[in-house]
């Protein structure tokens, strides 16, 4: 039964001065009273649809990127409801993390209180947008009733052998004596707080074995046909599956010492002129000669202060030193020097590479810098020359200077040399991955505690499930100094071992916030479950997510971790599917008008630019560059959503941000275009106000979601044209909102329909006009939900517009009785005539020759030729 809505006596609001704030506030209260946005219990055979935006970090202030993300998802959710689906459209908060901890330190406040305050502020801002979110399912990752289950899932992964602890490199601040996140290290490698030069240290860290799923993560990308190709490519490159060979180089003078390298180019083995170890490689200490000890130690100390990014940057010089050892090239017995270098990383492959400078650009640069031999072993195809002396040849070719393997193609050489090496025991085929296991340890306070206890007797002991959650202590010292804040809380750290009862201590690391965001989409399906993180049957009914919307910046980490979690939980029989998101839409950035001084790189506030036609720096007078860049405070180009809503209303903000650009493209903010959308909505108000029910029908009149039932034979030409425009709009907008979603062109079609109705409603029968307006209002409802609700009420619609069905095309309305035919004479267009849509060529020729156009331009001549393009034109050639 449809619940009653406000009476039509309130309809005067739309015909009076448009006051979006009053109108939108009124309808938002009504929707809340009615509970329209709650997720329904799906009826038998009713299709479920899960629409989800990537949930935000609660900074406390909404920005235009948020608005675009959530409005896109809201339109999709509203359309699916009107199509008859049971829709789940939730929202939550990615609430743990470094920003809240830093804010708490700076302001001397509790990060939990700070975060809850921000959540309340942002929810109020989101509510103003008219989003149809089921807030009953709201989750915050920092709340105990959520992170209890993050810990539960960690223990599941631990039980499955997917969580483990090992030593890893971290950023260490030697002054504050604490671990820093990468974001806390500036471009010069210094701590953001103390200014100290950051060191690289080895600490025990927790990892998840995401590499166990490397093949599944890359192979299953082919099944994600609803994902952008760009995202799938980015993930494949990040996983970085490489097929090659593992080669063993024996250390000269030592019987049992072997350096193992992985290479994707075993065909170039004869061209190896040195072997390079990572400075952290365990063999460096053992193989370094006494003569090189000082140089090697100094180099290792230098490298320990550099980040991985600095060590591997393409524009950085490739530094290294020899360690005084030699290895034997197994394919030809040559002795090769062993070096350590900054560009080789210990945790990639075996931490050792063979240097083939003629056929690897990085090796080429290193060899040139250190005067190492460069031997060509691959000749360029179809060329007598091997390659340009100024660079490495990394492409395919024919093997030369390779002994028995000369003349083979590179692909043949890879197989032949690997096979030969395998028969001799020094080579084997190998698949290598760029992907590393996921380091989840953070030496921070504001994160999910890792539910592990360390016991001297029992080792690593999981916290019993009945003792979850392991909660964060409150009123803790957050000075940002002295290592992990949790490690300072002895009352919290010291516990008894659950197994032996002896003294033990808690794990003081907290989890990476990506742990919390890797499963939140599952909790939304069963948010109040107090026994488990979610019920398998319920989750399997709603998931995978039908439509996921978020920024391209999450293409790798968040989306990859969520896919890993889903696969791991599937293998633990906790869920029945292997991929979390069926369809992914990555919306573009919102960019603002930006003024930049190209001489010094500074950004200038638009408020300081006096002449927009000739913008100049107010201090130097330098001419300013005008461009659009991602909105940010530092560029003075941000637009506050609250200001836009206060002035124009949420419907205008929604319409602009949906209309300005296709959803996946960057959007350039333009105040004039915002004003244009506001004027369009005002035109719609005037259009609706121009429709008046006849006096005889007024008391019982009610607009319907049903199509017109009058026979087309009984319709006037005006009525036929109005119905055709109406149903063409249904066809076009339905297409725009299906598959490859194009919200901007859908709004264009809305504009076309409204223009076609303008000034014509009083020229057709009430039933025809009412059908057209019913369609118009229903088509606009997902985009401008407040005004659509107001219009529906004014037109005496029953219930809420958002409870109505999506318009259905009447194919008969699209059938053309007549068409416009172009008449050409001597190939030039001379005019058009109306002809029956089903006229054949003979009839078209006859109608064309009898037309006034032909009489005028042929001047009594008979055409020598008549060229007919059915449905398009007739060309008369005298």
Swiss-Prot record:
Transmembrane segments: none annotated. Keywords: Aminoacyl-tRNA synthetase, ATP-binding, Cytoplasm, Ligase, Nucleotide-binding, Protein biosynthesis. GO terms for cellular component: cytosol. A motif ('KMSKS' region) lies at residues 630-634. The keyword 4Fe-4S does not apply. GO terms for molecular function: aminoacyl-tRNA deacylase activity; ATP binding; leucine-tRNA ligase activity. The keyword Protein biosynthesis applies. GO terms for biological process: leucyl-tRNA aminoacylation. Its main location: cytoplasm. It is found in: Cytoplasm. ATP binds at residue 633. A motif ('HIGH' region) lies at residues 56-66. It catalyses: tRNA(Leu) + L-leucine + ATP = L-leucyl-tRNA(Leu) + AMP + diphosphate. Its EC number is 6.1.1.4. Belongs to the class-I aminoacyl-tRNA synthetase family. This is Leucine--tRNA ligase. It comes from Prochlorococcus marinus (strain MIT 9303). The lineage of its organism: Bacteria, Bacillati, Cyanobacteriota, Cyanophyceae, Synechococcales. The gene is leuS.
